[in-house]
């Protein structure tokens, strides 16, 4: 598993991401490596403290078969989607769009967009619409993404 992030754990992450208060200020990749190794000391992990850009995306992600996108920023999501679909034809992309707010969790779903692009979320809600991100909807969208990754590994490509 390859983990890539440039950000540090902030108090606003604790209610919806898998970090602990003792990890505040740590780089997210380092904190997540620690947490995953507590769960499974045999896991193979590669961590990069980096911001994914047009210039480095292919290099950073070339070792992955499946790319699971978890950006906050819509422009970054679009950049990664465009890069993977246009320059990495052997990769699957599982992305997320629309998990903010207090809408029903039943609106979150996963769609197969192309033979190697899956999109999880409600495709409508936006963090700027008011209430922001709430843990249950974020967790459900992440679970959709994780399950889609497992299905791709199992060669079950339909949703």
Protein language model features and the residues they cover:
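Adenine nucleotide-associated cytosolic modules
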Residues: 1-159
